């Protein structure tokens, strides 16, 4: 969970001809499947694309991420660039210690990832719906781990087996100081 503080501000209200002062507001945010689904249902387009979001779309995603109750809508008008950058850094965090080491890089799927597709993966992999509130990158890692662990073991070619055995034998020879 991310906590950001929108600082207090002072500005001139042209309509009322007076200075207006706003109090600082602390928001609790979570980048989750729930917030992704809310945003996609409002904008009717996928959030997880390489396309830049407009300021309006970004601010609306912050609204969708908000866990704090009873936040006045005008509070979001006072988000600073620093607040937006902090949210973007949080969205990019892996939120897990799991790392994947792939033997061969295959070209990525061209399938567009939407909230419904992620829910489908959760159902297929028997991931409980409580996980929809996790940080999205942590959920993606769990989905990937479940997918990898549910696959049948990979069959190795004869060449790969011989190469692995040769490496193991060389390591044992070195460890035990023998010639074979």
Task: Name each model feature, range by range.
Residues 55-69:
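Short, hydrophobic/proline-enriched secondary-structure or compact coil segments at domain edges
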């Amino acid at each position: 969970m991310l906590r950001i503080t929108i600082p207090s501000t002072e500005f001139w209200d042209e309509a009322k001809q007076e200075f207006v002062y706003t109090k600082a507001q602390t928001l609790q945010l979570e980048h989750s499947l729930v917030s992704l689904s809310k945003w996609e249902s409002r904008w009717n387009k996928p959030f997880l694309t390489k396309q830049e979001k407009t300021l309006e779309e970004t601010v609306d995603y912050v609204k969708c991420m908000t866990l704090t109750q009873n936040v006045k809508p005008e509070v979001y008008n006072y988000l600073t660039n620093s607040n937006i950058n902090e949210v973007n850094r949080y969205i990019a965090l892996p939120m897990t210690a799991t790392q994947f080491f792939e033997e061969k890089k295959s070209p990525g799927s061209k399938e567009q990832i939407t909230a419904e597709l992620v829910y489908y993966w959760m159902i297929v992999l028997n991931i409980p719906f409580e996980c929809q509130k996790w940080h999205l990158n942590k959920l993606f890692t769990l989905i990937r781990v479940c997918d990898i662990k549910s696959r049948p073991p990979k069959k190795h070619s004869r060449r790969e087996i011989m190469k692995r055995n040769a490496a193991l034998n060389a390591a044992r020879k070195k460890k035990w100081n023998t010639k074979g």
